[in-house]
């Protein structure tokens, strides 16, 4: 068991190289600026990434480390009526872009999540967001996959192992939540500085 833990920790440490950590800080800056300007964060993904989208939105709307004002974040994965009606009446490929079309405003942020970087519906949402003047964050494995074309702020894990990618994603968005919360509300961060 300890050998497995050691190998996993080495894989995670390797994923957090200097360029990836710099990209994380750029995303923190973007989210802080956009929240301060009154914009919102839209988040989407499929499967485990859908759960991550909801988790991430909950950290911003609820709280991460301390009580504070709610921050405007919406998981586009959470409304089963929208997801099923758009899938049924149109196609699953546009379940997120349709919501970006309805909810996104220039200056807002769309954060697309995918371990593969090939999720068609997330790609459509990223393209729609760019067309509407939203900032785009692409979080994916496999060096970004097809997300490379549409992500203004790439958070691409240089790994093909899905569990490793998901673990890096979790650590990344927890760090981002912590840093945004601490910067916007002038509280001392309790986490590890990267």
From Swiss-Prot:
Residues 31-186 form the SIS domain. It holds the Pfam family SIS_2. GO terms for biological process: carbohydrate metabolic process; D-glycero-D-manno-heptose 7-phosphate biosynthetic process; positive regulation of DNA-templated DNA replication initiation. CDD domains: SIS_GmhA. GO terms for cellular component: cytoplasm; DnaA-DiaA complex. Zn(2+) binds at residues 55, 59, 166, 174. This is Phosphoheptose isomerase. It comes from Synechocystis sp. (strain ATCC 27184 / PCC 6803 / Kazusa).
């Amino acid at each position: 068991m300890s050998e497995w833990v050691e190998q996993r920790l080495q894989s995670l440490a390797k994923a957090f190289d200097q360029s990836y950590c710099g990209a994380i800080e750029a995303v923190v800056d973007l989210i802080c600026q956009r929240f301060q300007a009154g914009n919102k964060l839209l988040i989407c993904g499929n499967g485990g990434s859908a759960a991550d989208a909801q988790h991430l939105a909950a950290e911003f709307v609820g709280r991460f480390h301390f009580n504070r004002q709610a921050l405007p974040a919406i998981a586009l994965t959470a409304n089963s009526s929208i997801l099923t009606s758009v899938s049924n009446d149109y196609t699953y490929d546009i379940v997120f872009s349709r919501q970006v079309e309805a909810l996104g405003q220039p200056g807002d942020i769309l954060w697309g999540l995918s371990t593969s970087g090939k999720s068609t519906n997330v790609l459509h949402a990223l393209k729609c967001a760019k067309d509407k003047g939203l900032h785009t964050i692409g979080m994916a494995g496999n060096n970004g996959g097809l997300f490379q074309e549409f992500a203004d702020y790439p958070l691409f894990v240089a790994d093909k192992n899905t569990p490793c990618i998901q673990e890096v994603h979790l650590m990344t968005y927890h760090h981002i939540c912590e840093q945004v919360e601490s910067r916007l509300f002038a509280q001392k961060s309790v986490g590890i500085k990267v």
